[in-house]
Regions:
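Conserved beta-strand/loop positions that form the S-adenosyl-L-methionine
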Residues: 20
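Conserved acidic residues
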Residues: 15, 79
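Class I (Rossmann-like) S-adenosyl-L-methionine-dependent methyltransferase catalytic domain
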Residues: 1-12, 23-74, 94-97, 111-183
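Short catalytic micro-motifs in class I SAM-dependent methyltransferases
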Residues: 85-86
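A short glycine-rich, Lys/Arg-flanked "PGG" loop and its adjoining helix->strand segment in the class I
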Residues: 96-108
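A conserved beta-strand element that flanks and buttresses the S-adenosyl-L-methionine
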Residues: 82
Length: 183
């Protein structure tokens, strides 16, 4: 979804992207390579340390690393918010406030690119995670221009072993000339 967002938005020069749950920074580095200024957020210091070591010197002035839960992060206005397989790891009790903050951070014309997990995912019983059904996804995206929305189910692997994946790949744009209330 990140590549699709970058293709739609073009070069990032002078614009802000947020990478929520950036991990070791592979996607963050791709954004830097495309000229974006990036706020990279992750709760794991080890991942941020790996990212820090990989930042090209020429890009160092365009990146800010934040070691925090993205549910606790204060998100600045952004032209692109990327959340690659990270938002489901927000506890369901905190997800509504996080999603509201994401919506508020999207400037007019900005794109959200990311994934959410569906209710048939094998991890759906985990109380520390968030899962949505199709109607909830529709409600979350209300007011955004949905550019792509793909629901998929497959059996595969996760870090913990075999897993049934139920995912929603989302690419959605804040309408031009429309700021989310409170923005």
């Amino acid at each position: 979804m990140l590549l699709a967002a970058c293709q739609r938005l073009g070069a990032g020069a002078g614009r802000m992207a947020i990478d929520l749950g950036c991990g070791d920074g592979t996607d963050t580095l791709a954004l830097l390579d495309r000229g974006w200024s990036v706020l990279a957020v992750d709760i794991e210091p080890a991942g941020l340390a790996l990212l820090r070591a990989r930042i090209p010197p020429a890009s160092a002035g365009r990146i800010r690393l934040l070691c925090a839960s993205f549910a606790d992060a204060v998100l600045p206005p952004a032209h692109l918010i990327h959340a690659g397989f990270s938002l489901p790891f927000c506890p369901s009790s905190r997800f509504p406030a996080l999603w509201e903050q994401i919506r508020r951070a999207l400037v007019p014309g900005a794109i959200f690119a990311g994934q959410l997990f569906g209710t048939r995912d094998s991890w759906a019983a985990d109380p520390g995670m968030t899962f949505q059904d199709r109607s909830e996804i529709t409600r979350l995206l209300d007011g955004l221009q949905v550019l792509e929305l793909h629901e998929a189910e497959r059996d595969g692997e996760a870090y913990s072993g075999p897993k049934h994946w139920h995912t929603y790949d989302i690419l959605a744009r804040q309408p031009a000339g429309h700021a989310h209330p409170g923005h």
